[in-house]
């Protein structure tokens, strides 16, 4: 229950208004009961009452749910430009962002403001198709990406391995 209002009306009536939380995401490690509403506020509820499979999982330090919710809303349309969705968004205790896409790609976004993180992600999304096509892959083949580097990024693709100096394959 988000808010309950009780008013007395003349002559002998009582008007009760109940506002419920509308869950938009699951929160933290305890996704069985913790959820986030449209204002970024964490609340407790029974996850069985909603379709939890359709909700993203957000996590971060205590008291940072509003910031995480705002970043989710900022990153979601950026990823949508390449037909990717956000399954999970995490803010580490040290302030570093990590997103898991609906294709199970884990992208390390690093620290910074929304604009800084968003700019790194946009540069990555503009160039990743060129990189993946060199290996006859698509952007859905991205297994992991690390965007914390100053002038580039590290990328791991499904089905692509490297050879070490000894000729043995390395994942």
Can you name each region flagged by the protein language model?
Residues 3-171:
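Charged, solvent-exposed interaction patches on well-folded alpha/beta domains
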